[in-house]
Amino acid sequence: MKEEIIIAGFGGQGVLSMGKILAYCAIMQDMEVTWMPSYGPEMRGGTANVSVILSDKKISSPIVTKYDTAIILNQQSLDKFESTVKPGGLLIYDPNGIINPPTRTDIKICKIDAINVAAQVGNAKVYNMAVMGAYLKIKPIVSFDNIDKGLAKCIPARYSDLIALNKQAIEEGMKAVEEL
């Protein structure tokens, strides 16, 4: 099994954090992992993406040009990465901020209104975890038991009280994802 993922959106949407948490969850399952971020000089508002590879075998290269899954959080990222999803692959997107939705017919397309899920949970900062929940519902590559461990590894100890909130957002995101 090998899953090549691109997660892309604006800086501040938790793109890199989502990739890191997913990577740590996979590490807890003794999987091979690469996590390769890319972002501009802006702290927030610039585009950011992270390439994550999860595999049960050695990963020969972290460089990927075609992905099994694209998780897209803004129009610029959709324009850039929709064409990089392998035929038969998966594209998950949040329709908020997307003017021209994905159009490919050779891939599975799902949407998640993550802003709404985060509002229901009560904290806009868990937006990215709602999106991750959508991904894990469709592709349960990492076990739900390891999510706590992945969150604990990525969330600083002083914010450990937020682990339950993040996990709740993941669970709600799993319920809210829609296949198109």
Can you annotate each of these PLM segments?
Residues M1-L180:
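Active-site cofactor/cluster-binding pocket
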